[in-house]
C-alpha cells in the first residue's frame, strides 16, 4: 500500500512504451511498403506460424460464421450491436443549416477506414462491434478489418461480428505489418484513410510510425483501470474488476484508491486469496505482481487528484455517493459510476466505444466515437454586406503582417 505522495512520486517515474521496438517496426513497415502481399505472407509465417495463400476472407465466410452461431451468442452480439448503434446515432453530430448563418460547418464520413482487431491471447468480437458499428453509423463507404491469422482459422465470433456490422473486407494479417498494409496498400489490400482499434506494442508503434501518412485514433498502451472505493463497496466484486483488467495482458495496470486503510487491506487479502484459483492465473498474477497499486488518500480531493493524474482508460467509482465525483474526475477515458456499472459492461454492452485513451492521454484526448469517422470543414459564404463590414479590418491585419497580396485580394473586391 502506498500513500498518495509515495504513489505520485513513483507514478511520475513510470516509463511509457518500449522505444526499442521502434526500429523493428519501422523495418517491417518498409518491407511491406516495398514487397506488398509477399511481405505479409512471410510475416504471417514468421510471427504467427500460419501459411496463408489467400489474405482476404470471402463475404460468404462471414455470413456462414453468423449463421452457425448458437442462439445465445447471436442474441448477445445483436444486443450489443443495437445498444452501440443507438448510442452512436444519438451522439452523431448534426449538419448545420446553411440558411442560418454565413459561416458554418459540414461533416462527411471518411471514405475508407481500417480496423485492427487483436488476436493474441484472446479473440475480440466486441472490438469489431465497438469500432465497425461506429464507422457504419457514420456512413463510411468501405470498412476493412485486419486480424492476425490463426492455425484453426479466424475466430468465428469475430467473423460473425464483422457480418453484423457490415464490414466490407476482412484480411487475415496482424501486427505492425497489417498497419503498414492499410497505410500503403498492397496488391490485395487497399490503402485506407484512417486506422483505428487496439493492439499490442508493435501495433502501437506501427501506428506511431505511419502517423501523418494516414489518420489514427490513438497510440494505445496496455489496458488500465483505476477505482475509487469506500467501505460500502462490494470487495468481492472489486477483486473481479481488478482481475478483469489484469487478464488482458501482463502489462495491464490496476489502481485502487480509498480513504479507508482497512478497506484496502481487506481488498488485498481477498485478491491474494482469489488469485490462487482465478482463471487465466498466469497472466493475472504477473499483472498483479508488477502493475497493481493500492493507494491511501487523505480525503476526496486527494483521491480525485490521484485519479486525474493517472488519467486512466477506465475510472470506476464505487462509493456511497458516486455522483459527487462526476465533476471532480475530469481526465479519464470513461467514467463508470456505482455497483451496477462495472467497467466490463462498458466493454460489451453500455453503448460508448470501449476504444479509449491510455497512458495518461485522457488528459488531452477522448474515447472513440462515431464523430471520429467523419471529417469536418468550415463553409464561408458571405454576402456583399457582410464582406463590406469586415473587409477594412481584414485588409489592415494583412497590411501589418506585410502580406501585401492578401491585402490586395481584399481591396480589389471593395
Swiss-Prot record:
Keywords for the protein's UniProt record, in alphabetical order: Amino-acid biosynthesis, Histidine biosynthesis, Metal-binding, NAD, Oxidoreductase, Zinc
Pathway: Amino-acid biosynthesis; L-histidine biosynthesis; L-histidine from 5-phospho-alpha-D-ribose 1-diphosphate: step 9/9
Protein EC: 1.1.1.23
GO cellular component: cytosol
Domain of life: Bacteria
Residues in coiled coil: none
Catalysis: reaction(s): L-histidinol + 2 NAD(+) + H2O = L-histidine + 2 NADH + 3 H(+)
Cofactor annotation remark: Binds 1 zinc ion per subunit.
Sites where the protein binds Zn(2+): 245, 248, 347, 406
Annotated residues for binding of substrate: 223, 245, 248, 314, 347, 401, 406
GO molecular function, one term: zinc ion binding
Entry binding sites for NAD(+): 116, 177, 200
Gene3D superfamilies membership: 1.20.5.1300, Nitrogenase molybdenum iron protein domain (3.40.50.1980)
Record-linked InterPro entries: Ald_DH/histidinol_DH (IPR016161), Histidinol_DH_CS (IPR001692), Histidinol_DH_monofunct (IPR022695), Hstdl_DH (IPR012131)
Cofactor: Zn(2+)
Gene Ontology BP annotations: L-histidine biosynthetic process
UniProt xrefs under Pfam families: Histidinol_dh
Catalytic residues of the enzyme: 313 (proton acceptor), 314 (proton acceptor)
PANTHER family, alphabetized: HISTIDINE BIOSYNTHESIS TRIFUNCTIONAL PROTEIN (PTHR21256:SF2), HISTIDINOL DEHYDROGENASE HDH (PTHR21256)
The family this protein is said to belong to: Belongs to the histidinol dehydrogenase family.
Function: Catalyzes the sequential NAD-dependent oxidations of L-histidinol to L-histidinaldehyde and then to L-histidine.
Protein name: Histidinol dehydrogenase
Source organism of this protein record: Staphylococcus epidermidis (strain ATCC 12228 / FDA PCI 1200)
Gene name per UniProt: hisD
Amino acid at each position: 500500500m502506498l500513500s498518495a505522495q509515495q504513489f505520485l512520486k513513483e507514478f511520475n517515474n513510470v516509463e511509457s512504451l518500449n522505444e526499442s521496438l521502434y526500429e523493428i517496426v519501422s523495418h517491417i513497415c518498409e518491407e511491406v511498403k516495398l514487397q506488398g502481399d509477399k511481405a505479409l505472407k512471410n510475416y504471417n509465417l514468421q510471427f504467427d506460424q500460419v501459411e496463408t495463400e489467400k489474405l482476404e476472407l470471402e463475404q460468404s465466410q462471414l455470413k456462414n460464421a453468423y449463421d452457425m452461431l448458437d442462439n445465445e451468442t447471436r442474441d448477445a452480439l445483436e444486443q450489443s450491436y443495437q445498444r452501440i448503434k443507438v448510442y452512436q446515432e444519438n451522439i452523431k453530430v448534426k449538419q448545420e443549416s446553411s440558411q442560418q448563418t454565413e459561416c458554418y460547418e459540414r461533416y462527411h464520413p471518411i471514405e475508407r477506414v481500417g480496423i485492427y482487431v487483436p488476436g493474441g491471447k484472446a479473440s475480440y468480437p466486441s472490438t469489431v462491434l465497438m469500432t465497425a458499428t461506429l464507422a457504419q453509423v457514420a456512413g463510411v463507404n468501405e470498412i476493412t478489418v485486419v486480424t492476425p491469422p490463426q492455425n484453426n482459422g479466424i475466430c468465428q465470433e469475430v467473423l460473425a461480428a464483422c457480418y453484423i456490422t457490415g464490414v466490407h473486407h476482412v484480411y487475415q494479417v496482424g501486427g505492425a505489418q497489417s498497419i503498414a498494409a492499410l497505410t500503403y496498400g498492397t496488391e490485395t489490400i487497399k490503402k485506407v484513410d484512417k486506422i483505428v482499434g487496439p493492439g499490442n506494442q508493435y501495433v502501437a508503434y506501427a501506428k506511431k510510425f505511419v502517423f501523418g501518412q494516414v489518420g489514427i485514433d490513438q497510440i494505445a498502451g496496455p489496458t488500465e483501470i483505476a477505482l475509487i472505493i469506500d467501505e460500502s463497496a462490494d470487495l468481492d466484486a472489486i477483486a473481479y474488476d481488478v482481475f478483469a483488467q489484469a487478464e488482458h495482458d501482463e502489462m495491464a495496470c490496476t489502481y485502487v484508491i480509498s480513504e479507508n486503510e482497512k478497506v484496502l487491506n481487506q481488498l488485498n487479502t481477498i485478491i491474494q486469496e482469489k488469485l490462487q484459483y482465478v482463471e487465466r492465473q498466469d497472466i493475472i498474477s504477473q499483472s498483479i505482481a508488477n502493475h497493481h497499486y493500492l493507494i491511501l488518500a487523505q480525503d476526496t480531493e486527494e483521491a480525485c487528484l490521484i485519479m486525474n493524474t493517472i488519467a486512466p482508460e477506465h475510472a470506476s467509482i464505487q462509493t456511497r455517493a458516486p455522483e459527487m465525483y462526476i465533476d471532480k474526475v475530469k481526465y479519464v477515458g470513461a467514467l463508470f459510476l456505482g455497483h451496477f456499472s462495472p467497467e466490463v459492461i462498458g466493454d460489451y454492452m453500455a453503448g460508448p466505444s470501449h476504444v479509449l485513451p491510455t497512458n495518461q492521454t485522457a488528459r488531452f484526448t477522448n474515447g472513440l466515437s462515431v464523430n471520429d469517422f467523419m471529417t469536418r470543414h468550415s463553409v464561408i459564404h458571405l454576402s456583399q454586406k457582410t464582406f463590406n463590414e469586415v473587409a477594412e479590418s481584414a485588409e489592415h491585419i494583412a497590411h501589418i503582417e506585410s502580406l501585401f497580396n492578401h491585402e490586395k485580394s481584399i481591396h480589389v473586391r471593395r
